[in-house]
A protein has these predicted regions:
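GST-like domain detector, emphasizing the conserved glutathione-binding G-site
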Residues: 1-128, 142
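Short, solvent-exposed alpha-helical surface patches in well-structured domains
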Residues: 91-94, 184, 197
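A generic structural-conservation signal
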Residues: 27, 154, 178, 198-199
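Residue-level recognition of oxygen-bearing side chains
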Residues: 66, 181, 194
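Active-site-flanking alpha-helical
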Residues: 72, 165-166, 199
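Charged/polar, low-hydrophobicity segments characteristic of intrinsically disordered regions
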Residues: 134, 193-201
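GST-like fold's C-terminal all-alpha helical module
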Residues: 99-191
């Protein structure tokens, strides 16, 4: 498998899973914003010119959640996903999709308003609203983590999705002083060798 990868991007989620499963793969490394990702040769793989994109023989797939579901379904041997009839499975689905449904939309606004836009184009109202909503979304995860080591109890792909989003929120400068369970959760995730490797590629 060939993973098109950039540090501090959602591609880390995919590399994390590949490392947890100890699957062989190679990476094509970019920096976020690289012109190479906007070239037609890459847009044939990913029309949006973004990472991650995974090539598995003739198959090409993008979107981190879709890639993770594909890898687990094809190569996971039932690892990192609860049994479908278990009481944990619905919770797993909820937390797997919480990253992109609830956390990342607010983070995207914050990144645009604080990094991508020039100062004279920034909207402080949008930024304040996104920060408030992101904190609210993280509070829900905080409450869930009160009596758990991982989102559904056992470590799963939901942690690779939403756990990664939580870490990125912290890296973005969101205040975690009133989120002690998330602070512990982040430390627990960052201690995993597979994530250490995925983040350092």
């Amino acid at each position: 498998m060939l993973l098109h990868y950039a540090q501090n991007s959602r591609a880390v989620r995919v590399a994390w899973l590949l490392e947890e499963l100890n699957l062989p793969y190679t990476i094509k490394k970019y920096k976020l914003g690289d012109k190479e990702m906007r070239e037609e040769s890459y847009k044939k793989l990913n029309p949006l010119g973004r990472v991650p994109t995974l090539e598995d023989n003739e198959l090409i797939i993008s979107e981190s959640g879709a890639i993770i579901q594909y890898i687990i379904s094809k190569y996971g041997n039932n690892q990192f996903i609860p049994e479908i009839n278990s009481k944990e499975f619905p919770s797993y689905l909820q937390w797997f999709h919480y990253a992109e449904g609830m956390i990342m939309p607010q983070m995207n606004i914050i990144v645009v308003e604080t990094i991508f836009l020039p100062p004279d184009k920034r909207n402080e109202v949008n930024l304040a609203r996104a920060n408030k909503l992101l904190s609210k979304m993280l509070d829900v995860v905080e409450k869930n983590m009160e009596n758990k080591n991982y989102l559904t109890g056992e470590f799963s792909a939901a942690d690779m999705m939403t756990g990664h989003a939580v870490i990125m929120s912290k890296n973005l400068g969101i205040d975690f002083s009133n989120k002690p369970f998330l602070e512990s959760y982040i430390k627990r995730l960052l201690s995993r060798p597979a994530l250490k490797k995925a983040w350092s590629l």
